[in-house]
């Protein structure tokens, strides 16, 4: 049996939404005690909007403290925080600007197990999460879920994606197969952190196809 814990990966770069994201994630979880946060905190001491001192004494939080001038990019930051993985059963990788539904953890675990029961050994739930308005939440949330579509190749060879609506989502009873991986929202087995770590040599574009 697994430990039921979720290793939450957040790479943040001077993001005014970081604190709100953490609070909402914790508040909306059915069991916050099962959450383990690993945060790459790329910040300036002069910034006031992303100070995470309120979580300093919470043993669930593992913070990689990085001066923003020393950052080597999103992929490097994600790789840094992945070093804190300690055998949690699941992992959730998100950006530092998100909002959640009530009992989001139960929803994700249920979908994950649903796919396992259908024969998928290590299912991964991913996609572009619909937008929200931080000044008008939850009323300002886009309610239609998105999928990832190919957009174009840039001259350097990296592939760009764009979100597109899942038109028949109200008729769906289970997740649909995805063609691409989104680094800004991914939920799967915790083993993913060790088996498919982020390549620290990528800066930003290219991380999702690497």
Question: Where are each of the predicted segments found?
Answer:
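Catalytic cores of eukaryotic secretory-pathway lumenal/extracellular enzymes that build
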Residues: 1-210
């Amino acid at each position: 049996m697994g430990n039921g814990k979720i290793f939450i990966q957040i790479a943040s770069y001077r993001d005014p939404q970081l604190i709100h994201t953490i609070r909402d994630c914790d508040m909306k979880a059915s069991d916050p005690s099962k959450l383990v946060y690993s945060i790459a905190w790329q910040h300036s001491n002069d910034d006031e909007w992303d100070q995470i001192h309120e979580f300093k004494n919470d043993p669930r939080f593992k913070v990689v403290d990085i001066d923003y001038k020393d950052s080597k990019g999103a992929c490097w930051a994600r790789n840094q925080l992945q070093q804190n993985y300690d055998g949690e059963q699941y992992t959730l990788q998100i950006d530092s600007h998100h909002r959640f539904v009530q009992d989001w953890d139960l929803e994700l675990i249920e979908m994950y197990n649903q796919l396992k029961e259908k024969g998928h050994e290590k299912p991964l739930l991913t996609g572009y999460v619909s937008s929200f308005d931080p000044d008008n939440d939850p009323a300002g949330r886009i309610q239609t879920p998105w999928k990832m579509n190919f957009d174009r190749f840039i001259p350097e060879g990296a592939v760009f994606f764009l979100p597109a609506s899942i038109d028949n989502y109200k008729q769906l009873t289970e997740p649909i197969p995805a063609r691409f991986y989104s680094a800004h929202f991914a939920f799967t087995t915790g083993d993913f952190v060790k088996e498919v770590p982020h390549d620290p040599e990528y800066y930003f574009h290219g991380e999702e196809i690497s």
